[in-house]
Amino acid sequence: MKTFSYRSVSALILTALLATMPAKAETLKNLLQQNLTGAPEVKEALADVEAARNRTEQSKSAHFPTVSVTGSKSLSQYHQDKNDYTSKKIIPGVQAEMNLYAFGAIEKDVERSRKEEEYYRHTHAATREELGYTIGQLYLTALNMRESIAVMERSLARHQRILQDLAVVLENDEGRESEFVQAETRMLMVQQEINTYQQKLAATLNTLSKYHHKKIAANTLSDPFAQLSADELYHKYSLTDKARNPLYQAGAADLEARNLSLQAEEKKRLPRVNLVGSATREDRQIGVQVAWDVFDRASDYTVRERASAIAAGHERLLRTARDLEESATLAKINIQESQAQLKTLKRQIAASEKVVDFYRLQFDVARRSLLDVLNAEKELSNAELAYSNTQHNLRQSKLDYLYTQGMISAWSGIKNQEIKLNFK
């Protein structure tokens, strides 16, 4: 019995220790490292790269001969000379064709395919940045909701203390019941705000959990940029050349591919010189074939289509450059403004706390009304909530800046590596 008792006590102590142990922090960097290499979106982008590689090989294959096996059988024939009649048996044979000269059409098509492959490589990098930005936004939103709940819970605790004091007064003075009801109404309003934040937190965590192998708890979230100052952000994660952003690089590669596609289409309208040959059991022949589409209405419109696509790609690239530059500048402005606001709000919170304490003391000696105390409490809660939201804006602005520089992957510790895949 003693042994059983000791074991039971040990088990209870171990259970209590495990229950009181802090939950393992789930950092934003950990989430990004898990997803930016293995998420379905990233794997899809990698598959597109592999598909582009295969299309490049398809274009190169135009330089190689095409060999086919044939079988022919005459169903009906008429010749004036009886010696021209051939057998009605199935005649097996081989045909081959190889391009000798195409005025650079094949080479341009290969260049276009290679440029499209480059486009998909940059799109893969841009997809990682986009996914990292989405996960980062969800993470920061969940963190903001948790901090807002903490602010409102402190406000709720202060309202509960006011109610406790009023309950004691009410026992001796029933005429002050209206004050009790007024304070209780304010407390219920705070509770409702907490419920709203909790609902938003649960929804955000639920969405965030799809990027993790298990459900993420709110108490495991932490500030991902707590140790990253604005100066360090600009020094370590700024592009020396704005054109190196993967989103811009993808647009530039796409524009070059469109230009090469137009050039290839124009060269396809020129003559093609092919070496052709065939062989059967009875006959063998080889020769040179020149093909030139002197009239092809569809080709004219294809060239026009390619030209229009180039114009669209050029404007899209300009818009991408403009948007990235604007977003980077706006992120810097928001970082600077948020830092200034945090300093002011910190002083405002300290002053509001003193006002609440003073009003509580003055209310106790009937020099302030309960409404004054409740309003002061509301101002304190608003200041604390504004501080929490401004912290969120600062973090979001840092994430925005990383995105405009294409540096989310680099910040999370993921290096750009050579893509080596072969999907079967």
Question: Residue ranges of each PLM-predicted region?
Answer:
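A glycine-/polar-enriched beta->alpha junction
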Residues: 33-43, 50-66, 94-112, 122-129, ...
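Acidic, low-complexity, intrinsically disordered peripheral segments
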Residues: 2-3, 24, 216, 388-424
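Bacterial N-terminal signal peptides that target proteins for export
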Residues: 2-10
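Amphipathic alpha-helical coiled-coil segments
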Residues: 44-59, 127, 131-154, 161, ...
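Bacterial Sec-pathway N-terminal export signals of envelope proteins
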Residues: 23-68, 174-177, 209-259, 321, ...
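Periplasmic alpha-helical coiled-coil/stalk elements that build and connect Gram-negative outer-membrane
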Residues: 2-3, 26, 30, 127-244, ...
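Small/polar, glycine/serine/threonine/aspartate-rich low-complexity segments that form flexible
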Residues: 70-100, 109, 221-232, 267, ...
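Bacterial N-terminal signal peptides
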Residues: 10-19
